[in-house]
Amino acid sequence: MAEGEDIQPLVCDNGTGMVKAGFAGDDAPRAVFPRIVGRPRHTGVMVGMGQKDAYVGDEAQSKRGILTLKYPIEHGIVSNWDDMEKIWHHTFYNELRVAPEEHPVLLTEAPLNPKANREKMTQIMFETFNTPAMYVAIQAVLSLYASGRTTGIVLDSGDGVSHTVPIYEGYALPHAILRLDLAGRDLTDHLMKILTERGYSFTTTAEREIVRDVKEKLSYIALDFEQELETSKTSSSVEKSYELPDGQVITIGAERFRCPEVLFQPSLIGMEAAGIHETTYNSIMKCDVDIRKDLYGNIVLSGGTTMFPGIADRMSKELTALAPSSMKIKVVAPPERKYSVWIGGSILASLSTFQQMWIAKAEYDESGPSIVHRKCF
């Protein structure tokens, strides 16, 4: 199957914020672009501008001043299929420059993805893009594979949603998966809000992208939040400056760690949810008592929102406080965790043992979209 580049499987990880796509067997995705579809705010006035009705990804990002930006995925689940189709089309034809009818495609999905959504993905792949074969894998399971494990609990936190997914011998345990509708986008929103308190105003969809960049470059997680706050009041050691696209320089201090603190204290943004540490603990407690030790010893972080410096130490500290005192706790934060879902997909799709797992076009034609529930679990 993996004979040369011509029929190399494609791996497409559809996050809420970024699309990661490339070829199975590669060690990193070739295309990473924002999952945005932008539509012009005003009708074109210049003749010959050749204005498109929609822009995707980086092009939408660069023209963001004149567009209204929309993300077709909300909280990890696809909410707008037309836009989703545009994004896949852009992925295959413009980014990877391949003909999807010549390659098997491995797609990823959020844990607890509604059944109808898996069927719709399957249908679009076979009917719109005519792929010869496809497969849908759960994001967290792929992250675990990428870390070289088959048992562990994955905390996957991206732009739209966070999940804790316990996995035993390669199978996700659905009864113990917990979902937290708190992720990168909420942190960006919170940072927009607390920067306003400093007198900086960020309001439009385009300005939100600037704040997201501030968050990614300067935020970190405090080991002891209260103590860090006290320090920041008396010393300027946490202050950093950031240059805006127009050349203006802003200073950001305690906001640096106040922003991601929301992951551990959702109440800071008025959410009545457990933080990521408590959600991880609750997820482990829903599992059989015999496998908990294996889970505590293999807590794997995955996704862009786990990229904050200090997250593994803080996670370790919080879980040690919750778990039985004799329990050995190990939090693993692989350096490539921003892309570990994609990397896991690349590994899986290139295994010789996986080749009989694909859903072939013939099987789809015979059984219809529901085949996805029988073949992908």
Swiss-Prot record:
Molecular function GO labels: ATP binding; hydrolase activity
Subcellular localization: Cytoplasm, Cytoskeleton
Protein name (database record): Actin-58
Organism of origin: Solanum tuberosum
GO cellular component term, pick one: cytoplasm
Superkingdom, natural source: Eukaryota
Listed Pfam families: Actin
Major enzyme class: hydrolase
Matching SUPFAM superfamilies: Actin-like ATPase domain
Catalytic activities: ATP + H2O = ADP + phosphate + H(+)
Family: Belongs to the actin family.
PANTHER family assigned to the protein according to its UniProt record, in alphabetical order: ACTIN (PTHR11937)
